């Protein structure tokens, strides 16, 4: 029990404060940087900050769900999804740096809240936990679609990162459904969307 607590605490510290690492090459790494005006550059950096905070939330959600999951297949899928979300963290962190931006100052708050939510979802049972994962990924996919629409057309580097993230999120949702995810009730899905809007609006600025 103590060993597991140490492992989980270490994971939280690394997610929040250590540079994230990616096994896969960063999407758009070979694409030449395009000159963006100051306003566009700040806007894209803010969008990527929102995406980075979203990945912080995903890490905490999956950590909480994994801690309370009972089925080994569910634990494995959560671990695999978490690994890919770590890559997303690395990609968005790198892009924020390239654009001269910064990460959200509220990331520890997002992490703590998402960890608690993940623990709660896991306590409801594996199929409901998978349903939570699938719905989270669907909403993230829709959110990334919106970001693609708001990117400057010439910013191909950011576009490639977001498109790969979107493909990964869709795959996570498909796997969760294949493992028997329950569809979440509409009020719960609506509450998730409301919470996501609060996070994205705040992380864009802070």
From Swiss-Prot:
Reaction catalysed by this chain? a 5-methoxy-2-methyl-3-(all-trans-polyprenyl)benzene-1,4-diol + AH2 + O2 = a 3-demethylubiquinol + A + H2O
Organism placement in taxonomy? Bacteria, Pseudomonadati, Pseudomonadota, Betaproteobacteria, Rhodocyclales
Q: Organism, per UniProt?
A: Aromatoleum aromaticum (strain DSM 19018 / LMG 30748 / EbN1)
Which UniProt key words apply to this protein?
Cell membrane, Iron, Membrane, Metal-binding, Monooxygenase, Oxidoreductase, Ubiquinone biosynthesis
Q: Which domain of life is it from?
A: Bacteria
Identify the gene encoding this protein. Answer: coq7
Role played: Catalyzes the hydroxylation of 2-nonaprenyl-3-methyl-6-methoxy-1,4-benzoquinol during ubiquinone biosynthesis.
State its location(s): Cell membrane
What is the predominant subcellular site recorded for this chain? membrane
E.C. designation(s): 1.14.99.60
What protein am I looking at? 3-demethoxyubiquinol 3-hydroxylase
The membrane topology term of the UniProt record is:
Peripheral membrane protein
Q: Which family does it belong to?
A: Belongs to the COQ7 family.
Q: Which cofactor does it need?
A: Fe cation
